[in-house]
Amino acid sequence: LFLLLTVSSLICAQIPAGYYYQAHGKTGAELKTALHNIIKEASMLKYGSGEGATWEGFFYTDQNPDGSVFDMYSNETRYFNGFNGIDGMHIEHSLPNSWWGGIKNNAYKDLYHLYPADATMNMSKSNNPLGEVSGTPIRDNGLSKMGKNGFGNTYTGNCFEPADIYKGDFARSYFYIATAYEDYASLWNSPMMQNNTWPVWQSWALQLLMEWNKNDLKSTREEERAEAVYKIQGNRNPFIDYPDLVDYIWGDKTSTPYPFPDETEPFLISPRNNKTLDFGILLQGDNKTIDLDIQGKNLTETLNLYWKTEGENSGLSLSQESVTANEAINGKTIHI
């Protein structure tokens, strides 16, 4: 039996109050891991087309006002047809899924690095790394290019180079994947990556991504897309919220805690939103009690507690159905 406990509050609006609280005071690799623990849980759409799948996500995340598809891979104009796939377009893993063995896990379905892409350029991109093309491109469609990498002198194989106006978008997608899925460290198989949780990136790749992140600042469209993904998945991309986080995780400020804004709005430290409690297997007549710690910050009103279950006769009860602001601030344990 699983229980979803929801605490009613007035907390909402873009970056929720306290969302990054558990990352406060952390530096370098510890900061990255703290962010991993914050963003790793998400509700993913299934992969593919149709209702409840990737193309429904794209309908909300990558649709221009005129109904056309926002395509970072080509200048071709194509239009949405409901939640159906679109001829001439692919669901593109910007960080190739073969880099973690092609396992169809959450990263395979994560909209923060999935994009609707021109099929021809996507097939040319294949599973090549990002880079900056030197010499005559293998393919150039006027927006994206494929060819030999000329960035640095470590990796000289084929690479995919997006347009300058999208390089930061790709960099922030890559930083997100390396953080949200840092537990995939042993799976990484890429010219850009190492098999560790930090620093993750080969030195040339890290330099490339950091330069792209710095030179192509986040746009309003990128922010709006991230908010649309957040509404679907329930987790955020911290590198869009705070692009300079990369300096504190990988750059010249790794010994300095990131200066997150002061928290002035009310929020819960525990439990996190959508926390699930596992009662295990219970037989008829069994009794079991689970403790749940509640703690908040900047609270001024009483918290009302309730649960959502699929059946009306759940047999569940709470030791109390409300917690005062002072109780929550000081920390309160309730019994379920």
Regions found by a protein language model. Name each.
Residues L1-L4:
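Sec-dependent signal peptide recognition
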Residues V7-L10:
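N-terminal signal peptide c-region/cleavage motif recognized by signal peptidases
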Residues A13-R78, Y248-I249, S255:
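N-terminal module-boundary/linker segments of secreted carbohydrate-active enzymes
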Residues N81:
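Long, structured ligand/cofactor-binding scaffold of large enzymes
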Residues N84-H90, L95-E263, L277:
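Domain-level detector of nuclease and nuclease-like folds
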Residues P266-D278, K297-H335:
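Surface-exposed binding patches on compact interaction domains or structured appendages
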Residues F279, N287-K297:
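Core beta-strand segments of extracellular beta-sandwich domains
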